[in-house]
């Protein structure tokens, strides 16, 4: 089949591979056609001019894959779905207009349409954009506006779209940014990440060399993949990693050239490998997320300290002495012995003294623990009318940098020297309020505040 083909007005669908690999140059598609099937016009190398039918609702997978289409492409008003690889490799297209009824753009739908030379307006109705949907659409330009209801940005979705500009704002509905999703998008100048983001995968923003300003990673992020921000050389200021971070991949911040600090607020898996070759000073700031719901209150004629612990183990400092109840749902320990290799605890059975750092273990399922004296005590603290951090007292416990000894965090004793050895350029560990550390490495060393 070759030349120009006209179809009867009664035709309402084009079947799978109906005209694949034919030499037709032009098709007249009736307006009553509602669906174009899988591969219907695949590899029609002579097919150049395309006008989509008025009533079209669905464009199947690979429908126009590898066609030599030219000029602009207007997606018909009623289309709700563009299938996987539907226009893959249509290198002759130079303009693209998407309809407001569109809901899904399939994987690699426009991948390799490298001469599209226009702004990309993705309708707000779109909830799914597949992997590689606009990969290697090199000349797409202007600001990229992503739809507000988008849930996930897949792997390689906008990889190598080199001419997008301005600030990339990822909507708050997005929880995951896929592998190489924006890698080599080298003309973006700003980045705003969503408040509900959980995961940034391998190479997601690699080589986005013109991103500038301070990188703000949301507190909800639990995983940052290898090379996620590789060669992002324009960022300034500290990189403060979220306290919820559980895993960081190899070289996640490699070659960033940033001369400020890379600040860890947790001890994620892979932290010793997460920043090879970057120029920043490494810094650990352990803020104990287990204690965010602490509530301390006191009176001249009595006192009580209520603590919510999500971890089994924690550190404990009281501003008053307290007789340990025999039926307490927790156990309290002092340090019996401490060496480079071990910490030996000794259980307390009678009185806890004020201002001493103890180790507390939650013994049951109850997470809210109450530490109250059996008599009236005087609390020598200045009470504030509003919370200071999550405490109702200020000036009682100080955050401090430590360079040796042990830290109690995430139900483990962490040897500071070994922690620094795993990341040789780490300067210090920051110990926050309600966090004790154990100085030195000799036996019978007392905990410190």
Segments and roles (model prediction):
Residues 230-296, 300:
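Leucine-rich solenoid repeat scaffolds
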Residues 17, 39, 108, 132, ...:
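Tight coil/turn sites that cap or link beta-strands
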Residues 1-13, 23-35, 45-58, 68-81, ...:
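Structural signature of tandem-repeat unit edges
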Residues 337-346:
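Short linear interaction motifs
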Residues 268-328, 346-449:
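A short, polar beta-strand/turn micro-motif
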């Amino acid at each position: 089949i070759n030349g120009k083909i006209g179809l009867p007005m009664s035709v309402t669908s084009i079947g799978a591979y109906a005209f694949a690999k034919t030499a037709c140059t032009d098709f007249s598609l009736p307006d009553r056609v509602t669906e174009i099937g899988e591969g219907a016009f695949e590899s029609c190398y002579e097919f150049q001019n395309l006008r989509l039918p008025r009533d079209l609702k669905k464009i199947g997978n690979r429908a126009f894959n590898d066609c030599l289409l030219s000029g602009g492409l207007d997606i018909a008003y009623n289309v709700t779905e563009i299938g996987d690889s539907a226009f893959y490799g249509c290198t002759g297209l130079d303009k693209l207009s998407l309809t407001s009824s569109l809901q899904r753009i399939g994987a690699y739908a426009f991948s390799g349409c490298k001469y599209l030379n226009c702004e990309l307006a993705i309708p707000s109705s779109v909830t799914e954009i597949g992997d590689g949907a606009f990969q290697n659409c090199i000349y797409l330009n202007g600001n990229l506006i992503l739809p507000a209801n988008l849930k996930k940005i897949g792997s390689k979705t906008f990889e190598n779209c080199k001419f997008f500009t301005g600030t990339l704002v990822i909507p708050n509905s997005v929880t995951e940014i896929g592998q190489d999703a924006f890698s080599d998008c080298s003309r973006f100048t700003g980045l705003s990440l969503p408040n509900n983001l959980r995961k940034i995968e391998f190479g997601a923003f690699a080589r986005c060399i013109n991103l500038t300003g301070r990188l703000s990673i949301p507190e909800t992020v639990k995983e940052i993949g290898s090379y996620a921000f590789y060669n992002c050389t324009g960022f300034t200021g500290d990189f403060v990693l979220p306290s919820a971070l559980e895993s960081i991949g190899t070289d996640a911040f490699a070659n960033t050239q940033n001369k400020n600090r890379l600040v860890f607020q947790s001890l994620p898996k892979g932290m010793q490998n997460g920043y090879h070759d970057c120029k920043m000073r490494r810094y650990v700031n352990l803020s104990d997320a287990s204690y965010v719901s602490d509530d301390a209150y006191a009176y001249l004629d009595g006192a009580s300290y209520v603590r919510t612990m999500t971890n089994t183990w924690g550190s404990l400092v009281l501003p008053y002495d307290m007789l340990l109840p025999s039926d307490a749902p927790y156990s309290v320990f002092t340090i019996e012995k401490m060496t480079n290799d071990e910490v030996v605890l000794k259980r307390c059975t009678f009185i806890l003294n004020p201002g001493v750092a103890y180790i507390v273990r939650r013994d049951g399922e109850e997470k809210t623990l109450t530490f109250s004296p059996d008599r009236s005590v005087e609390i020598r603290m200045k009470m504030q009318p509003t919370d200071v951090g999550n405490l109702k007292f200020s000036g009682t416990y100080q955050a401090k940098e430590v360079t040796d000894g042990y830290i109690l965090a995430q139900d483990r004793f962490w040897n500071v020297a070994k922690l620094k050895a795993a990341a040789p350029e780490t300067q210090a560990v920051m110990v926050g309020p309600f966090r004790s550390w154990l100085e030195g490495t000799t036996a019978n060393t007392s905990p410190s505040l």
